[in-house]
Swiss-Prot record:
Name of one Pfam family that matches: HGTP_anticodon
Protein name: Proline--tRNA ligase
A single BP term in Gene Ontology: prolyl-tRNA aminoacylation
Keyword annotations from UniProtKB, A to Z: Aminoacyl-tRNA synthetase, ATP-binding, Cytoplasm, Ligase, Nucleotide-binding, Protein biosynthesis
EC number in record: 6.1.1.15
Catalytic reaction list: tRNA(Pro) + L-proline + ATP = L-prolyl-tRNA(Pro) + AMP + diphosphate
Organism: Nautilia profundicola (strain ATCC BAA-1463 / DSM 18972 / AmH)
Organism placement in taxonomy: Bacteria, Pseudomonadati, Campylobacterota, Epsilonproteobacteria, Nautiliales
GO MF annotation terms: aminoacyl-tRNA deacylase activity; ATP binding; proline-tRNA ligase activity
InterPro entries: aa-tRNA-synt_IIb (IPR002314), aa-tRNA-synth_II (IPR006195), aa-tRNA-synth_II/BPL/LPL (IPR045864), Anticodon-bd (IPR004154), Anticodon-bd_dom_sf (IPR036621), Pro-tRNA-ligase_IIa (IPR002316), Pro-tRNA-synth_IIa_bac-type (IPR004500), Pro-tRNA-Synthase_IIa_type1 (IPR023717)
Length: 574
């Protein structure tokens, strides 16, 4: 491809709303153009990267035995009504009506559609298992689309769905998909981790996320410093280590703590380590039937509440902050809430780490008073509704639940997610098969997604510098950029065209920059757009030399012109 004929454009300034590198460079480099909030056109460069990613994914999915399909983007709303997700998904599900006033949705995911495809078609266990996948457009009406392709409203996704007769066979496919995903992300040239995760709105009994490590990631990942333990902070656990309070209290007593509502103030006043205190976090739980209630979550004073864990612990759709007026309306005393003497109507959850804990400081449920020397040895002291759950967020330095080594927290961008769905979708949609005894059973399902367009941005977040993108060669739109210093010099153009022919004949994606531009802007475009290698055919050609540059390392090599091809191949294959 000649740059002079290629629909490519670069710009010096990034959009004002671009705050991450991938968004800035994709727009400046002419890969994408915004059409509306969270919706982008892909220019040729962007489409080439997208196709490279798609090809790697397709090759590995086909090798796993999965079969490609194409499901509808516009889906009847009635399918979503069958599973109850039409209501549960909320405003992110974009609903439309046709001229006959029939309701449809723009699919953000396709569980309902694929179950509808399979039910009545696969009738016997003899036809199982089957794994169907597609690489297709999706739409999620994000309230705040941002970060370019990382959180758009319209996006391209690879979603696969497997159907099984037994849980054991689902486990086999889940493990196969995990290995397939590892192969995909390795071949894409990415540094990633597979981590245990929350199933979220998709549902199911178990899931793993695939995270590209990047400082700009929105997700916190907990990883062990010694073993292979890794989990999203939403589900991460830790080894509980009990410490004995050196400050002993002969009797449980109330302490007057006027206007002291924070853990720090109370513990400093009483003279106790915050580890031996109980923090109350009050939320209003919203349920999918529209009802709500005030819930108190108790964690150690040194811990913070992990909201996804807390949401799952009470089976809520979401948790929102409760106002002081709402707390007072149910008999709570803001700033002085503790597990002893709570109003009987108030629901509460205690973190597992506090189970059987002693010598604690907590709120007395009375204004300006805290309790000193409290213990949770006897749950009956708290009433019959006491529930312990893991609701605290893991912190840096906590002990690994697997080996006991210190845990670290890093940032990641979610690019893949695999789920064990079980019968969450097949049962409500009455999708069944006949087992070996002739009995109707619901399909046991798995679900496996990859954010294809999101991978473009994730790759850049991991591979860039202050000049532009540094593409892994596996997904670069062009691997080599041949820059002609002066296109008016016939000898430069002839040599560049000959090298171009040799590289393309060798299967190397190459672009020939034959624009009648100054040398400076050509080099700037090479660095911005991010091709892995460039060959500069300039003034030194008359001395029999050209320059080869490695975009990743920044190294410059002056080589004999007859060695240019060999040097380029050496860098590419390194």
């Amino acid at each position: 491809m000649r740059w002079s004929r290629f629909f490519a454009y670069t710009q010096k300034e990034a959009p004002k709303d671009a705050v991450v590198a991938s968004h800035k460079y994709l727009v400046r480099g002419g890969y994408i153009k915004q059409v509306a909030a969270g919706i982008y056109d892909f220019a040729p460069l962007g489409k080439m990267v997208l196709d490279n990613i798609r090809d790697i994914i397709k090759k590995e999915m086909d090798a796993s035995g999965a079969q490609e399909v194409m499901l509808t983007f516009v889906t009847p709303n009635e399918l979503w009504e069958e599973t109850g997700r039409a209501k549960k998904y909320g405003k992110e599900l974009l609903r439309i009506k046709d001229r006959k006033d029939q309701s449809f949705v723009l699919a953000p995911t396709n569980e309902e559609s694929v179950v509808d495809l399979v039910r009545g078609t696969i009738k016997s266990y003899k036809q199982l298992p089957v794994n169907l996948y597609q690489i297709n457009l999706k739409f999620r009406d994000e309230a705040r689309p941002r970060f370019g392709l990382l959180r758009g409203r319209e996006f391209i996704m690879k979603d696969a769905y497997s159907f099984h007769a037994t849980e054991e066979d689902l486990d086999r496919e889940f493990n196969l998909m995990e290995e397939t995903y590892k192969n995909i992300f390795t071949k894409l040239g990415l540094d990633f981790r597979a981590v245990w995760a929350d199933s979220g709105a998709i549902g199911g009994s178990g899931s793993k996320e695939f995270m590209v490590l990047a400082d700009t990631g929105e997700d916190d990942i907990v990883v062990c410093s010694e073993c292979d333990y890794a989990a999203n902070i939403e589900v991460a656990t830790r080894k509980h280590e009990k410490r004995e309070n050196p400050v002993k209290t002969e009797v449980i007593e109330e302490v007057h703590t006027p206007d002291m509502k924070s853990i720090e103030d109370v513990c400093n006043f009483i003279g106790v380590d915050p580890y031996f205190s109980i923090k109350a976090v009050v939320k209003k739980a919203i349920y999918d039937d529209g009802k709500s209630e005030i819930v108190v979550f108790f964690v150690r004073g040194t811990d913070t509440l992990e909201e996804t864990k807390a949401t799952n612990a009470v089976g809520a759709l979401e948790l929102v902050d409760a106002s002081e007026e709402e707390l007072e309306a149910v008999g709570l005393v803001p700033g002085f809430i503790g597990p002893f003497g709570l109003p009987s109507s108030v629901r509460y959850i205690i973190d597992d780490d506090l189970r059987m804990a002693e010598e604690l400081v907590c709120g007395a449920n009375k204004k300006d008073y805290h309790i000193k020397g409290a213990g949770l040895l006897d749950a009956n002291l708290l009433g019959n509704l006491t529930v312990y759950r893991d609701i605290a967020a893991v912190k840096e330095g906590d002990k690994c639940p697997k080996c006991g080594a210190p845990l670290k927290i890093t940032k990641g961008i979610e690019v893949g997610h695999i789920f064990k769905l079980g019968t969450v979708y097949s049962e409500p949609m009455n999708a069944t098969f006949l087992d070996e005894n002739g009995k109707a059973k619901p399909f046991i399902m798995g679900c496996y997604g990859i954010g294809v367009s999101r991978l473009i941005s994730a790759a850049i977040e991991q591979n860039h510098d202050d000049k532009g993108i540094i593409w892994p060669k596996q997904i670069a739109p062009f691997v080599v950029d041949i820059i002609v210093g002066d296109v008016k010099k016939d000898e430069q153009l002839i040599f560049a065209e000959d090298l171009y022919d040799k590289l393309t004949s060798a299967g190397v994606k190459t672009i020939l920059d034959d624009r009648a531009e100054r040398f400076g802007p050509k080099i700037a475009d090479f660095e911005l757009v991010g091709f892995p290698v460039c060959v500069i055919v300039g003034k030194k050609l008359k001395d029999g030399k050209v320059e080869v540059r490695d975009r990743r390392t920044g190294e410059k090599f002056e080589v004999e012109k007859d060695m240019a091809l060999e040097k380029v191949m050496e860098i590419i294959n390194n």
